[in-house]
């Protein structure tokens, strides 16, 4: 039994039993993957996969039981490598971060800049995706830490910590009627075409809930996953925008105006997460604290010992 055999099984399950994709991910050949799986099955004494001819179609019952064990062995091996790197190369290595567009574009730059200055020999990888994709990248070992507002607390294998709270703003062109001195209300916002986030992104569900609670159905004419797109179409006059307040920069967004809407929509919480049981390098703890200063190493380590499924609050 060897790690490459175990990786072949894990990747086959992850990639829909497509051995071509597995071979590509493991930088080997498809026959090589098939051989690794067969040799492991022979050693174990049972089949891990249901087959249709030469194709894998699903896990067998025994395979479904074995897969979490295989994933645990591989996670342990990866942790062991990190331990070795921690003591052999304390200030060098790789840090992979998964984040939504809003976090990558607006929340992370200062932390990344400061971290790079302190750790020039650490290679940074930044992956962007939906909140669910961020969670999957953590679970699959593609990312060391993930940052998002939605979804992370829904995955029991993840340790989640609150980073910061934020609210939404309404953005409009200059001289828009909403810029008068009257109080901004949901009723007034609902009088105009709305451009905002796609469902599942950047607090969209809280925006919807706020309108529904008042019996309002806003005319959402366009949705997008990131604020830059929303701002572009507000500039074109398609409607007013509802975005995370952090996404508006008065110096850059000179053709727009922002109106604080913190009183209209519930507060959102952005969280940081990592896979439970993962050995974190010292520089990972430093990055986490650089991004969210209350999240010291002591706090993060305490969170990792909490009962699975609990969202750790600071």
Over which residues does each language-model region extend?
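Beta-alpha-beta core module
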Residues: 155-166, 181, 228-277, 286
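Hydrophobic hinge/microswitch elements
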Residues: 130-143, 149, 200-259, 307-308, ...
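N-terminal short secondary-structure element
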Residues: 1-31, 36
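A late-sequence structural motif
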Residues: 107, 258-302, 307
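Flexible hinge/capping segments at coil-to-helix
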Residues: 157-194
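A short LG(V/I)-centered, amphipathic sequence patch enriched
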Residues: 41-61
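Central regulatory/effector-binding core of bacterial HTH transcription factors
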Residues: 92-154, 217, 223-224
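Short beta-strand-centered segments that line the small-molecule binding cleft or hinge
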Residues: 87, 110-114, 132-168, 172, ...
